[in-house]
Amino acid sequence: MASSPCGGYTYCHMALPELRLAENVAGNFYVDNTCIDCDLCRQIAPDVFTSAGDQSVVSRQPQTPDGEFAALKALVTCPTASIGTVDHLSAKEAVAAYPEAIDQNVCFNGFASESSYGASSYLIVRPEGNVLVDSPRFARPLVKRIEELGGVRMMFLTHRDDVADHEKWAGHFNAQRVMHRDDIHRAVTGIERPLTGCDPIKLEDDLVAVPTPGHTRGHTVLLYRNRYLFSGDHLWWSANYKSLHASSNVCWYSWSEQIRSMEKLLDYEFEWVLPGHGRRARLNDREMMNQLESAIARMKSQSRLAG
C-alpha cells in the first residue's frame, strides 16, 4: 500500500498505482484491484464511483470541491485501502468528518473494516450514553472523535459477521457489548450482555432489541425511538430493485426463519432502515410498511420457487 495521505497515521493507506484497474477513467482518483465491492464508495460519492463487474471504479473524476471531499471520505472509509490519488491528496478533513450525522443524533462512522466485509457501523449520541451499532475499524482519529462525543456506553452487535474490532472498542471505552447468545462463537467472546430467546427485549426506554433469526441464527436488529431500525444484514434498500430487500443468496442460517423474522417487523413503526450492507432507506410510516409487506411477499415467492 502507498503511504498515508492522512498525516502519517497508519490506519489510512492508499491504493497502489501499479494495481490501478483499467476501467478507471484517467485522472487523480482511482481504484485498484484489491477492491472487494462493498459498495460504500458508491454510496458516499455516487458521482465519482460506479460498479464495474464485481468491483468499483472511478467513472468520473470529481468536478467540485464537494465532489472531491466526498471521494476523500470514500477513501477513508474503504475497508481495503483500494482507493488512491495520484497526487496523494490530504484526507485530513475527510478523516475529521466522521462520525458523520445521518439524521439528528444518529451518525455513520465511516472507517469500515475488511474483517466485516466493509459493513456500515453507526453511533447513536444520547444523554443516557452513546451506543455503537456494530464495529468500525479501531482507528485512532475515530476513537478520539467518539471520545469527544462522550465515548461508548453500549455496543450493539447485530450478528456474528460484523463484529470487526469489537474487543478493542469495548476495552477502550469499557462498553457493555450486547449480542444474541446464538451468534456468540470463538471469535466473539466476553459479551457482557448476551440476549436469549425470540421475544423483543427492552434494553432501555428508547432501545428495543428484536431477534430476527435468518441471516444468522442469532441475528438481532435494534429499534431506536420507534424511528431508526438498525437492521444489520437482515434488511436493506436495494439500489437495483429500488425497494426494501433481503436475499436468500446471503442467508447463512434459514430463509424460512428470515421470512418469519421479517413479518415480526410489521408490528413496529420506523422510518429509517440503517443496514450493515446495502443502502439506507428513509420512508414515511405507510410507505415503509408497504415496502416491508412487498419484500415479504417476494421472499415467500422466492421460497416457493426454490421448493
What is each PLM-predicted segment?
Residues 115-116, 126-154, 187-191:
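Pre-active-site segment of Zn-dependent metallo-hydrolases
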Residues 29-45, 65-81:
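Cysteine-centered iron-sulfur cluster-binding motifs in ferredoxin-type domains/subunits
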Residues 14-25, 43-60:
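Short, charged low-complexity linear segments at domain edges
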Residues 3-5, 9-13:
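Short, positively charged and aromatic/hydrophobic N-terminal segments
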Residues 53-54, 89-104, 130-132, 138-140, 144-147, 152-162, 164-217, 250-253, ...:
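Metallo-beta-lactamase
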Residues 13, 22, 67-127, 266-269, ...:
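Zn-dependent metallo-beta-lactamase
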